Amino acid sequence: MPDAEQLPDGWEKRTSRSTGMSYYLNMYTKESQWDQPTEPAKKAGGGSAGGGDAPDEVHCLHLLVKHKGSRRPSSWREANITRTKEEAQLLLEVYRNKIVQQEATFDELARSYSDCSSAKRGGDLGKFGRGQMQAAFEDAAFKLNVNQLSGIVDSDSGLHIILRKA
């Protein structure tokens, strides 16, 4: 049985914010597990051609449209958001199409229409790693290629479109 204080190389012990339980984070791949590791952490890709080349961090912009079912249905733009989820989706579809058709830039639309305070930076969230964003948002962001625009992503905060920059 491994010693509780001594972890193999590449692992870090953390505490879950939602459950208060300890978990273990692979510092190379940012994957986590509940069971205490007994072997050194594997590095991203593992050297095999099909092993994937998952980044440690991504740099993304996003445009958030909140709806009345959002976790906090208010924003810097509106004190009380009353639109439905369906209305939010229609708005995002219009914004996404404008970007794809090159009728507007992501930066312009985020500054004008995003319900996130990052709107002031054109939706720029900067770089972030695994475990820093809501799971649905994070999963979508890490699946994107550089300069790829996501479809509509549903999170507790509302609906998003995401543009990965790095």
UniProtKB/Swiss-Prot annotation:
Q: Which residues form the PpiC domain?
A: 55-166
- UniProt entry tagged with the keyword Oxidoreductase: no
Q: Which residues form the signal peptide?
A: none
Please list the residue ranges that the record marks as compositionally biased, kind Gly residues: 44-53
**EC number of the protein:** 5.2.1.8
Coiled-coil segments on the chain, per record: none
Would I find Repressor among this entry's keywords?
no
Q: Which reaction does it catalyse?
A: [protein]-peptidylproline (omega=180) = [protein]-peptidylproline (omega=0)
GO terms for cellular component: cytosol; nucleus
GO biological process: what's one of them?
A: regulation of locomotor rhythm
Q: Where is the WW domain?
A: 5-39
Q: What class of enzyme is it?
A: isomerase
Q: Please provide the record's keywords in A-Z order.
A: Isomerase, Rotamase
Region Disordered: what ranges?
A: 32-53
Q: List the protein's name.
A: Putative peptidyl-prolyl cis-trans isomerase dodo
